[in-house]
C-alpha cells in the first residue's frame, strides 16, 4: 500500500483545514469513524451503503467522526451515505472525510436524507484525484433543520474528472448549504457542477461554489450552474458562484438563476386535466430529476428517483 498523498499538488491555502473551526473541533474530539480501502483492480458490482442511524434516545450532544476512503488503481465503488434520524432533540454531527482516488479509479458518492430532524449536520469532504480518475457526487436532501456539505476536490493529475449534482427539496424552516471548491491543479482536467433547489415556506438554500484554476492547468474544462425554484415569498436562495483562473487556455463558465414555477407549463398541464397540485409536483419532479440523468447505473438511478418522489410527496 502506498502512503497517503492527500496534499500532493495542493497549495497550503487550498488544503489548510485548520482554517475551519469545526475541523479543529473534529481533530480534537473525533472518537469514531471508518476506514474503507478498495484494492487495486477490484470493482464492486453492487452499491455499498453506509447507514447513519440516530436513535430516538439521542439527546443534546455533539458527535465528531472522521472517515477515510481510498480507491486504489483501476478500482470502482458506488457508495451510498444514508441518514435515518429518529431523534426529536437538538444535536450536532460534525464529520470529516478524506478521500483518495488513485489512477483510473471511479468513486460514485451518493448522499440521501429525508428524515425530519432538529439536529445540525456538518460534513467536510476533502478528495484528491490522480490521473484518469473520476469522482461523482449526487446529493438528495430534505427534512433537516440545518445541513451543510463542504466539499473540496483537488484534481491533481491530468485527465482527472469530478462532478457534483444536487437536488434539494426544502420545506418549513429547513436550512441547507452546499459549499464547493474545485481546484484544477493539473492540465486537461474536467469539473461539472449542477445544483438545484426547490424552496417552500420559510426554507433557505445556500450555494457557494468556487472553481480555482492554476497557471499550469491548461486545457481545463469547468462548468458550474445553480438553479432554484422559489415557491413563495418567504423562501430564500443565496448563491455565490466564483471563478479564479490563472491559466489562459481554458473553457470555464458559471451562473445562477432563481424564479418561480413556469406558469405556461402549469397551465398546459392543467389544460390536460391534471389537478393543479399534481401539476406542481410533476414540474418539481422534472426540475430536480434532471440532476440524476448522468448516473449510469439504472438500478441506482431508479432507487434515487423513487426517494426523490417520496420527498416531493412528503413521504
Regions found by a protein language model. Give the residues of each.
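Conserved beta-strand/loop scaffold segments within soluble protein domains that form the structured core
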Residues: 15-274, 288, 295-315
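Single conserved hydrophobic/aromatic residue that forms the stacking wall/gate
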Residues: 2-14, 18
